Amino acid sequence: MATWLAIIFIVAALILGLIGGFLLARKYMMDYLKKNPPINEEMLRMMMMQMGQKPSQKKINQMMTMMNKNMDQNMKSAKK
């Protein structure tokens, strides 16, 4: 009977470890993306120039604000 108990504890520990690892990795990635967004102003400026638009600083600031706002909303909804 002791071997069954040991097997149950091992399986439970593995499941808890997987869940804990997933949650820690998810939190790390959320924090990393918040500190280092995947796109910055310079990349946005280059994209607009490639699309044939003349990027003004006001347009770039508006787009960055929209992207940051969208990212914040996504992070809040992911926490729920």
Swiss-Prot record:
Annotated Pfam families: UPF0154 (PF03672)
UniProt topology in membrane: Single-pass membrane protein
Main localization of the protein described in the UniProt heading: membrane
GO cellular component, one term: plasma membrane
Keywords linked to the UniProt accession: Cell membrane, Membrane, Transmembrane, Transmembrane helix
Recorded family membership: Belongs to the UPF0154 family.
Name of the protein described by the UniProt record: UPF0154 protein SaurJH1_1431
